Regions:
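Hydrophobic alpha-helical segments at protein termini of multi-pass membrane proteins
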Residues: 1-144
Length: 144
């Protein structure tokens, strides 16, 4: 399946982490206010106000298939440009939400220099992993 649309696999993990991280990265008030207090700039933020699972469901059932179709159907090299935009956009957001979630979970609560430096380790590992996946996917794209 990766050979049919390798560019999709270059950003799919980033989208999943971004969408799920958006929900889990919401402040404590989000969960106690009936979903009224939230942090999200996406135009579909009203879905977060209805229910977090609705937000996840809509994002994954509409956005994932759309991005799959987008990089499959757009002509070369524009499809590569679209994949790069998705990698950069969702990559930035997924790292942001990942870090917010770790801080909210109390994994890195210290404000000293060592705690702040150590808080970068999970993000570095994550970035290395998703960039390797993207690299391998793009490599398959150029080989085909």
């Amino acid at each position: 399946m990766i050979k049919k649309n390798p560019l999709f696999y270059s950003f799919v993990i980033l989208i999943l982490v971004d969408v799920i991280g958006t929900v889990f990265g919401q402040p404590k008030e989000y969960w106690t206010s009936g979903y009224k207090v939230f942090h999200e700039a996406l135009p579909i933020f009203p879905l977060l106000q209805i229910h977090p699972l609705l937000f996840i469901l809509v994002c994954l059932s509409i956005w994932l298939p759309f991005t799959y179709w987008l990089v499959l159907r757009i002509k070369k090299p524009i499809n590569l440009w679209a994949a790069m935009a998705l990698i950069i956009g969702h990559g930035y957001n997924s790292v942001f939400w990942f870090r917010v979630s770790l801080f909210q979970a109390g994994v890195f609560t210290g404000r000293d220099q060592l705690s702040m430096a150590l808080s970068l380790v999970p993000m570095t590992v994550y970035v290395l992993f998703v960039s390797w996946v993207a690299f391998k996917s793009i490599q398959v794209y150029f080989i085909e």
